[in-house]
Amino acid sequence: MNQRRSESRPGNHRLQAYAEPGKGDSGGAGPLSGSARRGRGGGGAIRVRRPCWSGGAGRGGGPAWAVRLPTVTAGWTWPALRTLSSLRAGPSEPHSPGRRPPRAGRPLCQADPQPGKAARRSLEPDPAQTGPRPARAAGMSEARKGPDEAEESQYDSGIESLRSLRSLPESTSAPASGPSDGSPQPCTHPPGPVKEPQEKEDADGERADSTYGSSSLTYTLSLLGGPEAEDPAPRLPLPHVGALSPQQLEALTYISEDGDTLVHLAVIHEAPAVLLCCLALLPQEVLDIQNNLYQTALHLAVHLDQPGAVRALVLKGASRALQDRHGDTALHVACQRQHLACARCLLEGRPEPGRGTSHSLDLQLQNWQGLACLHIATLQKNQPLMELLLRNGADIDVQEGTSGKTALHLAVETQERGLVQFLLQAGAQVDARMLNGCTPLHLAAGRGLMGISSTLCKAGADSLLRNVEDETPQDLTEESLVLLPFDDLKISGKLLLCTD
């Protein structure tokens, strides 16, 4: 008679274990010997019946329970021990796409209690119960192989089972053989630290990450303060952030589909607390990451007129010399959008001439249109911004890259006499030449700007200078008397007055 032991489990499950005595076994349900597995000796076979899951939510559903079997001895092979560990881990998760789902009821491991006959351990549904069949536990294919054929790592539907298999140290020897008293013993893992499986990589070497491409800022920011979740593989910590969890490191190094880092997103969504957290934890190199439009977080902070964010980024060491797709630095953007407060923050702490670094600000740097910051401020007719730039060392006579105009030429083109007077008082060269040889007086005379022409003449402009077309300012004006540098001319005793 077979000895039958039955234990009830929660959720209408029943675990039945039968001990079948084999040849050479005198004590009923004794331990399996090594020869019994190979069919050359006696021993008993253990058969485990696992009923169908009732009340489970789909495939892989149902409560997890631990298998209790007689004490494991040396007769058990490592594939069998790994299979028991996978059973202890509970039901497996759904299979990954592209893999054929396993069929329930196939043998987990085989042992021969008698020569020519094999004892089978299988999972079979209980006919008295109905419900979805559970997926085959992980490690079944490995249990069917011999010790020499077992692969070191297998990927199937059972992620939890894979972890339990990896938690078994390969160098650990099999348990010592000894008599079994037949009492149920819990099947537990060998002692030792549990190692997490490493992430799978594709053929191109890119990391397969389930959160890749997520554009949700709320989910990303929640990882910074939420509870630590289990990460599939350990990651190397960034410099100076070794105390962070892998989940927090992943959130801090998040990059969206547009190339925006968490620092970019904190500026865009006006989240100063998150920005300060990033500045405190991340190294300076992360702050200079450019998105798909070649914009740094400093560019965006200036665009959105956030002086506090600009000051914090500058103090952290963010580069002020990086250019976007238009060749504009953050200061170019501040001049274009006339954000005076942001421009002040960018110019704070600027190193002395000749002592700058690669991250220092070059006020003479031109964008792809050939315009320096002073040129842009002049075209915007923003005199306070022009004063700020000149006070911080901007070259007043720097020429733009397309035609060689200076700020004074551009001020004449804006027809703002006040800007012309301001630049002349600041020391602008009154006879600065363009690439075609024209001076500011050529431009004023050719446009018929009599008031600006008079201002230039009073400042010492030469009305006889010729351009490449051999023209003087007097040749370009109809009223040549206006270009004379005198203000006390009299005709018939009457004072000649120059009016705008």
Swiss-Prot record:
Segments of skewed composition (Low complexity):
161-186
Q: What kind of modification does the protein receive after translation?
A: Serine phosphorylated; followed by proteasome-dependent degradation.
- Top-level taxon of the source organism: Eukaryota
User: What molecular functions are annotated in GO for this chain?
Assistant: protein sequestering activity
Intracellular or extracellular location(s) = Cytoplasm
Asked whether the keyword Magnesium is assigned, the reply is no
Biased-composition ranges, Basic and acidic residues, are 1-10, 196-209
Cite a GO CC annotation: fibrillar center
Main subcellular localisation: cytoplasm
What keywords are annotated for this sequence in UniProt?
ANK repeat, Cytoplasm, Phosphoprotein, Repeat
Q: What does the record note on quaternary structure?
A: Interacts with RELA, REL, NFKB1 nuclear factor NF-kappa-B p50 subunit and NFKB2 nuclear factor NF-kappa-B p52 subunit. Interacts with HNRNPA2B1; the interaction may be mediated by the RRM2 domain of HNRNPA2B1, and HNRNPA2B1 may interact simultaneously with FAM76B and either NFKBIA or NFKBIE to form a complex.
What does this chain do?
A: Sequesters NF-kappa-B transcription factor complexes in the cytoplasm, thereby inhibiting their activity. Sequestered complexes include NFKB1-RELA (p50-p65) and NFKB1-REL (p50-c-Rel) complexes. Limits B-cell activation in response to pathogens, and also plays an important role in B-cell development.
Return the protein name: NF-kappa-B inhibitor epsilon
Native species of this protein? Homo sapiens (Human)
The gene that this protein is the product of is NFKBIE
